[in-house]
Amino acid sequence: MPFEFIDAAHAGQAGSDPLQDELALLDLAAQGRQVAQLWEAPLSLVVPRTYLRHAALETARADFAQQGCPVFLRMSGGGLVPQGPGILNLSLAYTVEQPPGARSDAVYLHLCEVIGDALQSLGVDTHWQAVAGSFCDGRYNLAWGPPEAARKIAGTAQYWRRAPAAMQTADGQRHLVLAHAVLLVSAGPVQINARANAFEAAIDSGRHYDAGKVVSVREALLASGRAVDDDAALMAQVSDALRRSVGQTPPPA
């Protein structure tokens, strides 16, 4: 069964929580649907709920919101993620017949394959690996460049929920999974890292990110000597490539 693309109801609306549409995808997966969504968020930051342990979090959130950069809380783990112009999100929601411990790697690898194939069709070769110094670093980053000097181009995350009783299997192991990736298309690494570092400093987390550890699709294309369209055209080109790749890559069972 191919993925069904769902429009994001509030994508790009200033002040709206971009994660609400994403969580709604799990409700569709609970109906047995296999759904996908491409979306852009307004200028903002997204942090996991584990950041609630920082005493200065709510004060920093209020300060950043006043500056036009709201900070949203998400259900999945990991670290801080910048959002805004030039950044494209891909969310996939579907059912899995086994628990997270058995299939989380497969879910990550599927997401990396979808994005990697899309980027390869545009002339950008990537692979998955950790990139120390990048925001929200993880084992299943999608990275560009040789392994010893790789730069993060996309980050991935996932959130699991047990399937409702109406669609549960006899062994009780059916789950709903929301797999999410954030892809830097034309966003400037210096600008997004400065914003991320300012927030980490405001909550005194001790974290600091290196702009040289991330790269955009635009930068990767230019580095390979390819002509690059304007930002809007490049975003459309990347979106089309992702749609094709999602349609050609079935998820893990």
Curated annotation (Swiss-Prot):
<feature type="domain" description="BPL/LPL catalytic">
    <location>
        <begin position="30"/>
        <end position="236"/>
    </location>
</feature>
<dbReference type="Pfam" id="PF21948">
    <property type="entry name" value="LplA-B_cat"/>
</dbReference>
<dbReference type="InterPro" id="IPR004143">
    <property type="entry name" value="BPL_LPL_catalytic"/>
</dbReference>
<dbReference type="InterPro" id="IPR050664">
    <property type="entry name" value="Octanoyltrans_LipM/LipL"/>
</dbReference>
<dbReference type="InterPro" id="IPR045864">
    <property type="entry name" value="aa-tRNA-synth_II/BPL/LPL"/>
</dbReference>
<protein>
    <recommendedName>
        <fullName>Uncharacterized protein H16_B0148</fullName>
    </recommendedName>
</protein>
<dbReference type="GO" id="GO:0036211">
    <property type="term" value="P:protein modification process"/>
</dbReference>
